[in-house]
Amino acid sequence: MKRTDLLAMLDLTLLDRNASEQDIHRVVGLADEHGVAAVCVFSEQAGLASKQASSRTRIAAVAGPFPKGAADLERYLLPIQEAIAGGAVEIDLVLEPGIGLEASMMVLNGVRMATEGLALKVIIETPILDERAVRGAARMALMAGADFVKTCTGRRGGCSKEATRWVSEEIRRHEVTTGERAGMKLSGGIRDLDGLNGLLDVVRSVDPGIIDQGRLRIGASSLIESLI
C-alpha cells in the first residue's frame, strides 16, 4: 500500500496524562501536515487538541479507566462527556476482561448510548486473552454497536497475528450475520512497516473489505516516523 494510504488509516496517538501543551501541539501539527485519520489523546486533553487541530483532523479520545477498564459504567460516562465537550468525535475505551457478561454488556450498552453519533472503538485487550475470550469479547462489542474493535491498549502486550485473525474473522462473521459492516483498529507495539504489513496481510486474507472499504485504523505513536 502507498504510505499516504497508510497515513490515512493512522490514529496518531499520544497517551500521556502529563503531556505538555507543546507535546500536544507537536502531535497535532504532524497530523495536520500528513493527513492522518485522527489524533488520539486522553479525554481531558481533547479540548486542547481540538483547538490546535485543523478542520480536517479528527480528534479521538480515550475515555474512562486506562489501561485497565472497569465494571462500573459511571467511570466512563463523565470522561465521555468531557471528551465530547472538548470536540472529540471518536471515543476509544477499554472493555476490561474478567468482569463478567452482565457487567460487560451494561458497560457496552451504556457507553454506546453515551456516544450516539460518534465513532466508538472498544478495546478488548487480546494479549491477555485466549482465542475463545477474544472472540467472545469481540462479539459482545459488535452486538452492542461498536464501530471498531481495537486489538489492545499496548500496555499489557502487543498485537499478534493470531489475535488479528480472530478479530478479523469476528468482524466478517458479524457482517455475514447482521449485514452491519464494523471496523477494526490494530494497536499495540506497531512501530515499523514490516510489523504493520504482517498484520495487514492477515486482515486481507480474512476479509479485504475491512481495508478496502475504509474500515481499518492503526493506532500508533511512533509508526509515523516510518511513513513520512
Regions found by a protein language model. Give the residues of each.
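Alpha/beta enzyme core
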Residues: 2-34, 44-184, 193-225
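Short donor-sugar binding/catalytic loops of nucleotide-sugar-dependent glycosyltransferases
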Residues: 190
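Short, hydrophobic beta-strand segments that form beta-sheet elements in well-ordered domains
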Residues: 38-41
